Amino acid sequence: MYPAHLLVLLAVCVSLLGASDIPPQPLNLYQFSNMIQCANHGRRPTKHYMDYGCYCGKGGSGTPVDELDRCCKIHDDCYGEAEKSQNCAPYWTWYTWKCGSDGPQCDDSETGCQRSVCECDAIAAKCFAKAPYNDANWDIDTETRCQ
């Protein structure tokens, strides 16, 4: 999915939430984006991680191209495990967290699905912050490089 599609989807979802009687809640992808910014101290825009390597962005296959792409594969696998073990929908699960001096920290009151998804996102955000970013691995031809 292209970054523009994600933004349109986010705008539609936020509009629908605002039109309901339920107070709007942040979507998980919005929270994850904020966690990434917390972990990397705003050094790299979140959109740079949306179409990177074989696993950063929608889907994923093949062998990760580098350390950053491995972070995305680990995140994908973590979401998969949360879906199986917690029977939850990670992309739509809301949780409470804060940006601490050591990066994103999940609220201790979170349990179950919320805790699992929050931990997946926090671990990935910290991994992103540590991994080198290689411009050559952004927007690669996944058909040929991710088999």
Curated annotation (Swiss-Prot):
Cofactor dependency: Ca(2+)
Cofactor note as given: Binds 1 Ca(2+) ion.
Alphabetized GO MF terms: calcium ion binding; calcium-dependent phospholipase A2 activity; phospholipid binding; toxin activity
One BP term from GO: lipid catabolic process
GO cellular component: extracellular region
InterPro entries: PLipase_A2 (IPR001211), PLipase_A2_Asp_AS (IPR033112), PLipase_A2_dom (IPR016090), PLipase_A2_dom_sf (IPR036444), PLipase_A2_His_AS (IPR033113)
Tissues/organs with expression: Expressed by the venom gland.
One matching Pfam family: Phospholip_A2_1
Active-site residues, record numbering mapped to chain: 75, 121
Coiled-coil features, chain-numbered ranges: none
Signal sequence segment: 1-19
Reaction equation(s) it catalyzes: a 1,2-diacyl-sn-glycero-3-phosphocholine + H2O = a 1-acyl-sn-glycero-3-phosphocholine + a fatty acid + H(+)
Function per UniProt: Snake venom phospholipase A2 (PLA2) that inhibits collagen-induced platelet aggregation. PLA2 catalyzes the calcium-dependent hydrolysis of the 2-acyl groups in 3-sn-phosphoglycerides.
Protein name: Acidic phospholipase A2 S7-48J
